[in-house]
């Protein structure tokens, strides 16, 4: 970190103030100017400096702003952000000419980053879950040759963990590292329903349409699932879609949507039992699944004694309010937002009665 000077502190103070458009020329002369617009800053709840510009209205972390300045070979901003406390070493990930390399050396950068430092920057940058930041992360990391220096096992482990709810996680082993990162950012966008980011990836990577569908089903995003089914040609059977939805417990929204489109709810119950998804199993019975004896036999084969005990009770039946087969995602969300399985409630009451 460079020592603070009066000029540095003045610029920092000015960047936190509201400045009228008539006075923008002052900001430009002070170097608080980027992409033809003023730079402002604030301190977030984690006591981190956040930089805002016309291009990054939601804000980006100071270290992220630095690496973007390095990528653009913007000497003035590299020096400014370093003076404000950015880690100049992170700039090594994006240096693309010798002049910028020498400037970073002059500002205190070492010759190369360790794997732990690269992973730390990766975590810091992706922390902000917004459309603009996920797109930015994709642009920074997905095709970055410097990431070839990272221990692939470490980074792949991180990605597998964050996408652990996906039922096709193993397929990430079979693709190039840059493609895996692209799918990772796309998956995060779908997981958190970041509409602008989803549209960006949809337009840029149309050959990943099936990946988007898998993510929507696995992450219980009924809104994006509805969008996919109504705007693209789906090359997956409805029962396969239901199978993917059932692999993660509490995926009531996407399970219901597949049910409404005609998926076999008995098959869904068997899949839920096989994978020990107890809440999904109860929900399937709410939807009218009645393969209780078959499910009990399957649970016994897999050694799921708790499921065998649950299904031994003769108390389960469909919930009439779920049988209308609604496909409007807003209505589905309203119906199921705070839903508690009617059959699970019946089981709970039975257990309490037996205890008493």
Curated annotation (Swiss-Prot):
UniProt keyword terms in alphabetical order: ANK repeat
| The ANK repeat ranges on this chain | 61-93
Q: Which domain of life is it from?
A: Viruses
The UniProt entry's GO biological process terms, in alphabetical order, are:
taxis
Tell me the function of this protein. Plays a role in virus cell tropism, and may be required for efficient virus replication in macrophages.
Family according to the record:
Belongs to the asfivirus MGF 360 family.
Q: What is this protein called?
A: Protein MGF 360-3L
Please name the source species: African swine fever virus (isolate Tick/South Africa/Pretoriuskop Pr4/1996) (ASFV)
